[in-house]
Amino acid sequence: MALWGGRFTQAADQRFKQFNDSLRFDYRLAEQDIVGSVAWSKALVTVGVLTADEQRQLEEALNVLLEEVRANPQQILQSDAEDIHSWVEGRLIDKVGQLGKKLHTGRSRNDQVATDLKLWCKETVRELLTANRQLQSALVETAQANQDAIMPGYTHLQRAQPVTFAHWCLAYVEMLARDESRLQDTLKRLDVSPLGCGALAGTAYEIDREQLAGWLGFASATRNSLDSVSDRDHVLELLSDAAIGMVHLSRFAEDLIFFNSGEAGFVELSDRVTSGSSLMPQKKNPDALELIRGKCGRVQGALTGMMMTLKGLPLAYNKDMQEDKEGLFDALDTWLDCLHMAALVLDGIQVKRPRCQDAAQQGYANATELADYLVAKGVPFREAHHIVGEAVVEAIRQGKPLEALPLADLQKFSRVIGDDVYPILSLQSCLDKRAAKGGVSPQQVAQAIDDAKARLAL
């Protein structure tokens, strides 16, 4: 049943109907549409459109419909209704007859869909927050178990300075904490109800919109009807949150793909999150991580697409805005799936400590320590930097690490170097010296783990 047929003398072309209809994706808003309709029925009682008995009948029928939808949401797709609003109204009329036709009084699909989508977004944000914190917790637990796993840290994918696997885990905890904060901020701006704004100019009935917002669990009602039905900032914000969050997960995946490679060999992934080759029997491929990395692109595309859709739209509602849902649903589904999968990857990961430490001892990752040693002896840092560079060239020529160079060879580059340099060049010394807040020293890493556990209530 179309909700707008009286103005037209010809039926819609079937090709246009298929092009125009949105039920195939907005059926996901069924629960929110029904909940919003229950609240609207209560509001209509306050302005005399419905009697208390009529409202009771409508609410009972809507609650039955809600249970039917929860039991089998796919039933909705068997209908040829234009959208979820048409489907809900049609099913309501099936249940209560002519009374069902009174429910839409004073309401437009413009404020209705805006309300439905905000309700759905609020629920989905809470799911994302839960999954985000679960992944943070998994990273903290992995960090706690690997505080003594020394490995090389990289810049430009070249070994740079020694770190620990725990410190690496905690870097991603920080990224995820920012993602969590962004979602919390978005949730605050989501928490205003557009219901009662009508098509664009507000409703003609003196409904208490603040009360109506409270019935739906919103903190307040929106302030401007024209903005309320035009606004899709929350869609852009959530897509932006997802895009940033997926960049973090993609970097996490890329790091672990490299760590798991034969060239690095720092970790072993569980069989539960890897697959094999149809030709090469020895292969164990990090498919879960590669898919996380690959899915990042589709989320970025959803954000870009929505920004382009909205950029030239006049106020208020335009059918272009129907394009908000598919990209949003897919992006947030993808982000949620990837958060869960990243946590699963960490469950069963094995850190190969000897291989990590061997790699950290190569590549002259302790060169900065030698420069700092020279600074402590009174050599200006820029000069110390040059001296150490020359010492590294000599070590490479001899095929030795810095700490294996004889003292006489080191003193060719600076006479201030003494026997006390060798303890300074050990990996543990490199870590211990990074004791300022946020550093990689064992004390700082342990403190960071404790702080994260307290914040996450672990």
UniProtKB/Swiss-Prot annotation:
CDD domains: Argininosuccinate_lyase. GO terms for molecular function: argininosuccinate lyase activity. Signal peptide: none annotated. Its EC number is 4.3.2.1. InterPro entries: Arg_succ_lyase_C, Argininosuccinate_lyase, Fumarase/histidase_N, Fumarate_lyase_CS, Fumarate_lyase_fam, Fumarate_lyase_N, L-Aspartase-like. The keyword Chaperone does not apply. Keywords: Amino-acid biosynthesis, Arginine biosynthesis, Cytoplasm, Lyase. The keyword Zinc-finger does not apply. One of its GO terms (cellular component) is cytosol. Belongs to the lyase 1 family. Argininosuccinate lyase subfamily. This is Argininosuccinate lyase. The lineage of its organism: Bacteria, Pseudomonadati, Pseudomonadota, Gammaproteobacteria, Enterobacterales.
